[in-house]
Amino acid sequence: GAIIAGAALGFNVHQTVLKALGQVSRKIAIGVDNESGGTWTALNAYFRSGTTDVILPEFVPNQKALLYSGQKDTGPVATGAVGVLAYYMSDGNTLGVMFSVPFDYNLYSNWWDVKVYRGRRRADQAMYEGLLYGIPYGGDNGWHARKLGYGLKGRGFMKSSAQSILEIHVTKA
């Protein structure tokens, strides 16, 4: 993982991350821009399917963006890159970010969501399911936005391809 200036987050940065992952059939470059006014501290990443070779950036200051990536497990296995990230925010709440790049596009599509949870909460299967079965956004090559509560709003975009990009901006409402 890495931290960059929030204003620098864009599709060229994501493409660089995807290229670094090599010839993996299911992979995702994730960028989350912190414009919340506070600092975020990494709690953990939970993978329902797949893995990563990078470390979740520990701190994300205001006006900076975190870069992260996920990929299917190596070898001839039927897995995608599916999971959730959790960051503890300086306001005492937790930001959860769910991503899903499935193995089988005959049955599934790309999905993503972002939510603020009250208090401190680590990413786990329950957080993943809550975000997936709540009101997630499809990875449909379009921008989506909603209020997150706690004075914040989220706006994001996800590609529909198996080599996907997820870009999220968390700002003051």
From Swiss-Prot:
Protein's cellular compartments: Secreted; Nematocyst; Target cell membrane
Top-rank taxon: Eukaryota
Recorded GO MF terms: channel activity; toxin activity
Pfam family, one: Anemone_cytotox
Single GO cellular component term: other organism cell membrane
InterPro entries noted in UniProt: Actinoporin_PFT, Anemon_actinoporin-like, Cytolysin/lectin
Region described as N-terminal region: spans on this chain: 6-25
Function: Pore-forming protein that forms cations-selective hydrophilic pores of around 1 nm and causes cardiac stimulation and cytolysis. Pore formation is a multi-step process that involves specific recognition of membrane sphingomyelin (but neither cholesterol nor phosphatidylcholine) using aromatic rich region and adjacent phosphocholine (POC) binding site, firm binding to the membrane (mainly driven by hydrophobic interactions) accompanied by the transfer of the N-terminal region to the lipid-water interface and finally pore formation after oligomerization of monomers.
Domain comment, as recorded: Composed of a long N-terminal alpha-helix and a core region rich in beta-sheet structures. Before the pore formation, the alpha-helix binds the lipid membrane, partitions into the lipid-water interface and stabilizes the monomeric molecule on the membrane. Finally, it traverses the bilayer, thus forming the transmembrane pore.
Main location: secreted
Family under the similarity heading: Belongs to the actinoporin family. Sea anemone subfamily.
Site features described as Important in the initial contact with the lipid membrane, chain residue numbers: 108
Residues the entry annotates as binding phosphocholine: 49, 82, 100, 102, 128, 133
Name of the protein in question: DELTA-actitoxin-Oor1b
Subunit record text: Octamer or nonamer in membranes. Monomer in the soluble state.
Keyword Transport included in the entry's annotation: yes
Chain segments carrying region Trp-rich region, which is important for the binding to lipid membrane: 100-115
Keywords annotated in UniProt: Cytolysis, Ion transport, Membrane, Nematocyst, Secreted, Target cell membrane, Target membrane, Toxin, Transmembrane, Transport
Organism per entry: Oulactis orientalis
Single GO BP term: cytolysis in another organism
